């Protein structure tokens, strides 16, 4: 794990976390915020700069948190919002669509088109890696 690989809890973090990668900074900031006792969590691009394995772990933690607390998740990666109770799709600075993933997909609007395009890109990327 990150902690063990970097000297454990004795690791010294430089000013502005200059000795951490972008992904490490993101994970550390998220860990600090998720351990705080809050009623509402607002996570803006919580998995940006994160590898896919870490993203899956983070999203599982967010899903578990959402069972007990209010979570507002802002994400350009629509696969992360699929399990949300309510999805607000934004366009030109306003709410263009609102509903569950299933309802938004059934409507065939902008959310459905963007989700399908992202899914096709990700599947193509995975095939290229194999």
For each of these PLM feature ranges, what is it?
Residues 83-89, 110:
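Conserved catalytic segment of ABC-fold P-loop ATPases
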Residues 55-67:
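Helical segment within the ABC ATPase nucleotide-binding domain
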Residues 41-45:
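Catalytic Walker B motif of ABC-type/P-loop ATPase nucleotide-binding domains
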Residues 1-14, 37, 53, 110-113:
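Conserved "ABC signature" C-loop
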Residues 30, 74:
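Hydrophobic anchor residue at the start of the ABC signature
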């Amino acid at each position: 794990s990150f902690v063990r690989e970097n000297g454990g809890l004795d690791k010294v973090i430089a000013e502005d976390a200059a000795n951490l990668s972008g992904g490490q900074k993101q994970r550390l900031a998220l860990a600090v915020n998720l351990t705080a006792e809050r009623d509402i969590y607002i996570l803006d691009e919580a998995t940006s700069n994160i590898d896919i394995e870490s993203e899956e772990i983070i999203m599982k933690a967010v899903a578990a948190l959402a069972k007990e607390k209010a979570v507002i998740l802002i994400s350009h990666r629509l696969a992360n919002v699929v399990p949300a109770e309510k999805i607000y799709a934004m366009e030109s600075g306003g709410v263009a669509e609102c509903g569950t993933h299933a309802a938004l997909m059934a409507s065939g609007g902008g959310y459905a088109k963007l989700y399908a395009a992202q899914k096709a890109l990700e599947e193509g990327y995975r095939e290229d890696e194999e």
